[in-house]
Every structure is written in structure tokens, then in C-alpha cells.
């Protein structure tokens, strides 16, 4: 337990759980961990780009929402940070606090468009999926061709929460500028853990002085930080100044270096498909989607996948739901490339595809489907993989009444 009275709780829906978790955010963790992480992001960015002019404008943050009762504040971590930041932070960030904390997402987006279209925005931060929806609406609202015409001084997106690779092409299309930089952070409701400190690398520096004690699980064995090995993957456990003790985050990290300690997030401990012995993990899926999109000229906005179970007369398969920002030249070619890349990456999948599994099926859903699903379910992330059909069927239910816009390819 944390000493003293805890008045802030971060609501974390995770990706696969139906129940929200309420995580304590102590004053110590708020300033020693979360706020310090934000300061270090700025410091490390300046270290990489000394000629930056990012501080000559404002940072746009698309926060969540929070509620108050009996002196207790509960909400998304982003909302708690907005709620507790001092008044002078408004000199550096946008939109106004009242707008940032609005509960209705569509109303929030419209107000941000009105308030921020004429601001000098030099950076934005947050989860890629929600920011992509906002920025696309900003381009529509202003009637411009892309975001560079709206905010010509824009240079930084500090992103976290989900893997960025599936969104990279969409952001590059929206912000066609060689001066735009993308900086990954590993921050969550539970704490702030790592920052990308070198743009030439695809990993992050593990932050060791934020009030968090790290342990790592490899199967049944748990090792301290000094016991990890480069190239190995571990489930991460933390004990921290917010009162969490040996708490398993559900993330799988891979160490790329032990001097200094560098990691990349390789996936989730519970996000996989293994209905037929194929053992497909999130990293396989993200890579396959990226390759298929590049090969067919597509931009993928969101996706999720799960099993279609075997029947008496039919083979099992993987079923994908995909929302495109730009449709592929050929849907069939996209599915074939996706399938082929999964077979190349995963020998278990290849073996099953050549025997007991049918080719994958793909549902193409209208733009905004996943955003509506997340709002309805109170989630901030789309689960990429699930070993059952609950997410698949729930997302497809969101398209009710729009069946003409939904296709199945296989």
C-alpha cells in the first residue's frame, strides 16, 4: 500500500479485459514518475535536435475524461495530468483545460478544431489512434490538404500506448514533412518506463530513477534487472511509489542492450491467437499488416483478428477486421500478402496453413468503426489479437445498419 491518502485513481481498461482497473496515482508518483517523464521527453528531444523550435509554440494533448466524488478523482491518466497541472501550463499546451476534459469525444474534437486551428502548434502527444481521428478531422475542418498547411511549424509527435508501426504510413500521409519527428515513449497508467533517446534506433532507454523497481519474468523464473540478457523477452513486473507491488503489466519487452538498459515492447502477454496450434503473436501480426499495406499501397487505420473455429464440414481460419485510411489496390492481394508474410515469420502458422487452416478472411469496415467501438466499450486501445471471438463479434456489431460497407475477402 502507498503511505497516506490516495485521492487520484487512473482508470485503465486494458485491451482484453471487460472490467476496468482502478490504479492508485499518489502525489509522489505523479511528480516523480509521470511528470518527470514528460520533462525528460522534452530534454531528450532537445538533445537529439538542438536547433528545435518546438518551444516557440504549443503542444496539443488529446486528454481523456475524469470524474470527482467525495474528494476522489477517477479518470484516464491523461485527464488526471491535465487536472493536476498548474495554471501556467496553459502557456505551453492546448486546448483549454475545459475542452481537454470533455467527456463526449465528438464534441471534444469539434471544439479542439475551433480552438486550435489558428494556434501555433509545434507538437502533439498521446495515443496514435485517437490523435489520428482528431488530426484527420482538423484537415477536414480547415479545408486544407494536409496538416502541414494547418500547422506549418509542427515537428514532433510523442506517442505511446500502442505500437506505432501500423499507423506510421497514415501519419506520413497526413504530415508529409521531412522535419516531422516521431518519438516513442513507454508510459502507462501504472508508470512512465522508457523513452526513445536516439532517433537512429528502434528501441527505448529504460528509465531507472522514476521510483520503480523492475523485475522480469521468463516463464516461471523471475529475475531482477541485473539478471536480464540482451535478446531475451520478458514479462515486466513493477513495484512502485504508487503502491503497486510485483504488479505484472501484461507487456512483453525485449532487451536490446544491458549497458545501458534498452528495451522495445514486443507485445502483450495475453494477445495471441493459438486456436489451432499456430501461436501467432502480436509482433507477427503488426509486421504482416505493415508488409501487406506497403505492398498494396494501403494505409491501415485499425485492425483486430481472432479465430474462426472449425466446424463439422469446414476448416478453421483467422478472421480479420480492417479499417483502411486508404484502400489497397486489391483486397485479395492484401490478404494474400498478409497470409504469406505470416507464414514467412511463423513456422507454426505456416505448418497449420498448409494442413488444417483455411486462408484468412477479412472484413473491411467503414472509417470510424473502431473509434465508435472504443468509445462504446470505454477503451483506449484496440486489441490486435484475441484467442476467442468476443472482440471480433463486438466490433462487427458496431457496423450494424452499415452492412453494405462491410465486405469479406478470403
Predicted regions, residues:
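Conserved pre-ATP/AMP-binding loop-to-beta segment of ANL
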Residues: 1-11
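Short coil/turn segments at secondary-structure boundaries
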Residues: 2-4, 53-57, 354
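Conserved adenylation A10 loop of the ANL superfamily
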Residues: 9-23
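Short coil/turn connectors at secondary-structure junctions
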Residues: 19, 55-57, 153-154, 180
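Short, solvent-exposed loop/turn and secondary-structure capping segments
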Residues: 23-24, 136
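Conserved structural elements of the adenylate-forming
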Residues: 25-48
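Conserved AMP-binding loop of ANL adenylate-forming enzymes
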Residues: 41-89, 99
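Active-site glycine/GP-rich loop and adjacent strand/helix microenvironment
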Residues: 77-410
Amino acid at each position: 500500500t502507498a503511505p497516506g491518502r490516495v485521492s487520484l485513481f487512473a482508470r485503465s481498461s486494458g485491451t482484453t479485459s471487460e472490467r476496468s482497473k482502478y490504479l492508485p496515482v499518489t502525489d509522489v508518483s505523479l511528480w516523480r514518475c509521470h511528470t518527470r517523464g514528460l520533462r525528460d521527453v522534452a530534454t531528450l528531444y532537445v538533445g537529439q535536435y538542438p536547433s528545435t523550435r518546438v518551444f516557440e509554440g504549443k503542444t496539443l494533448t488529446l486528454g481523456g475524461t475524469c470524474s470527482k466524488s467525495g474528494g476522489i478523482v477517477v479518470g484516464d491518466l491523461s485527464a488526471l495530468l491535465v487536472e493536476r497541472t498548474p495554471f501556467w501550463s496553459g502557456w505551453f499546451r492546448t486546448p483549454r483545460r475545459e475542452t481537454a476534459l470533455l467527456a463526449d469525444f465528438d464534441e471534444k474534437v469539434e471544439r479542439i478544431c475551433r480552438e486550435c486551428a489558428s494556434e501555433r502548434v509545434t507538437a502533439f502527444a498521446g495515443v496514435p489512434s485517437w490523435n489520428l481521428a482528431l488530426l484527420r478531422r482538423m484537415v477536414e475542418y480547415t479545408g486544407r490538404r494536409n496538416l502541414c498547411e494547418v500547422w506549418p511549424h509542427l515537428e514532433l509527435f510523442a506517442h505511446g500506448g500502442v505500437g506505432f508501426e501500423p499507423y506510421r504510413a497514415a501519419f506520413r500521409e497526413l504530415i508529409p514533412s521531412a522535419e516531422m519527428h516521431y518519438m516513442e515513449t513507454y508510459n502507462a497508467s501504472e508508470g512512465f518506463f522508457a523513452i526513445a533517446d536516439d532517433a537512429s534506433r528502434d528501441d527505448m532507454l529504460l528509465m531507472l530513477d522514476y521510483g520503480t523497481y523492475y523485475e522480469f519474468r521468463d516463464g516461471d523464473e523471475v529475475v531482477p534487472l541485473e539478471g536480464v540478457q540482451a535478446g531475451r523477452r520478458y514479462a515486466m513486473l513493477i513495484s512502485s511509489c504508487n503502491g503497486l507491488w510485483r504488479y505484472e503489466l501484461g507487456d512483453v519487452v525485449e532487451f536490446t542492450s544491458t549497458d545501458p538498459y534498452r528495451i522495445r515492447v514486443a507485445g502483450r502477454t495475453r494477445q495471441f491467437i493459438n486456436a489451432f496450434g499456430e501461436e501467432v503473436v502480436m509482433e507477427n501480426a503488426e509486421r504482416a499488416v505493415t508488409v501487406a499495406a506497403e505492398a498494396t499501397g494501403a494505409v491501415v487505420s485499425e485492425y483486430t483478428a481472432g479465430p474462426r473455429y472449425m466446424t463439422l464440414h469446414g476448416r478453421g481460419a483467422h478472421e480479420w477486421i480492417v479499417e483502411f485510411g486508404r484502400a489497397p489496390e486489391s483486397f485479395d492481394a492484401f490478404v494474400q500478402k498478409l497470409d504469406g508474410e505470416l507464414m514467412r515469420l511463423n513456422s507454426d502458422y505456416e505448418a497449420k496453413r498448409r494442413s488444417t487452416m483455411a486462408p484468412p478472411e477479412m472484413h473491411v469496415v467503414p472509417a470510424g468503426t473502431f473509434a465508435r467501438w472504443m468509445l462504446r466499450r470505454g477503451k483506449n486501445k484496440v486489441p490486435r489479437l484475441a484467442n476467442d471471438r468476443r472482440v471480433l463479434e463486438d466490433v462487427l456489431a458496431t457496423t450494424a445498419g452499415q452492412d453494405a460497407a462491410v465486405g469479406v475477402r478470403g
